[in-house]
């Protein structure tokens, strides 16, 4: 039987428990008996959304531009991730602190009624022609997902026009999952689909891509590098700060 590919929606994993209200002792007992069940509750968004997490996961990747197919407010909410990126640079001794390159297509009421694909095309073209990035990440949003704008088709159509830039659509619509951390998975799945599997290049034996979002501190990063170094593994910690397109492609193993 063929193994079912993970969709990027965390609650789709078999045996996944997202909602639970009990003691640690009861959790252990129920888990051992195989009768652990998630609670039945309503849902309200109390944290950042999936799109913000998808953007935060890749924000420090060099040679990149980030295109949000959304209303302006969605990108405004990403300021938290931008701050984390800037602080992370300072912790790593980077003197010239830089901001990520973010462009928004500005989905408005007219776009919702008549479609916003033309706005996205224009945003992608402006982003690529202005910054000439190696990677251009195209993020879906709640609004663009609800009206059905096809970010995959637009990326496919424009890829031939911009062969020096890899266009990567990321499906991080907020209504797909009740767990905002699914946004991290959406970003990493997109890297695997559009970058790591795009072409075959020589691998560096013993070089590991260690995927982690910007919520991981510099101290945690150094500790993970130390532990892996002890077993003879060189770490390419991505998408943090010093990583780039070519080094991702050369990785021998991937860890998340």
Where are these regions (language model features)?
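An N-terminal assembly and electron-transfer interface module characteristic of large anaerobic redox
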Residues: 1-256
